[in-house]
Design a protein with these regions (language model features):
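N-terminal short secondary-structure element
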Residues: 1-31, 35, 63-68
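Short alpha-helical
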Residues: 34, 55, 100
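A short LG(V/I)-centered, amphipathic sequence patch enriched
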Residues: 40-56
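Alpha-helical linker/hinge and terminal dimerization helices associated
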Residues: 42-43, 63-87
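Interdomain hinge and pocket-entrance segments immediately C-terminal to HTH DNA-binding domains
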Residues: 82-109
Length: 109
């Protein structure tokens, strides 16, 4: 599973249209469609009912919150890394990763 596929899935959930979701993601519609086919193959079933309109299947509804969380956690990790990149090199010492440290990076659970 690739982050790109997750982002496309989430855009398609919001747009409910392959062309608009592809435009939003800055890719061609066939590229988005192929990514969704690959994700469906990996997850073992259809994520969307494609006719007459785009709606989530039972599997799509089941995986949506997990994929949303993955995308959010990736955003938190990216923000934490960017913040650390702005810290002076002398302050970038290795530290043990403890539960409190994980929570400060935006991880819940």
């Amino acid at each position: 599973m690739q982050m790109q596929q997750i982002r496309y899935f989430l855009a398609l959930c919001e747009e409910r249209n392959f062309t608009r979701a592809a435009r939003r993601c800055g890719v061609s519609q066939p590229s988005l469609t192929n990514a969704m086919i690959a994700l469906e193959r990996e997850l073992g079933g259809a994520l969307f009912q494609r006719r007459p309109e785009i709606v989530l299947t039972v599997l799509g509804h089941a995986v949506h919150p997990y994929l949303q969380r993955i995308a959010e956690n990736a955003d938190h990790a990216r923000a934490a890394a960017q913040t650390l990149a702005n810290v002076r090199p002398a302050n970038r010492e290795a530290a043990p990763l403890e539960q409190d440290a994980r929570h400060s990076l935006g991880r819940s659970g």
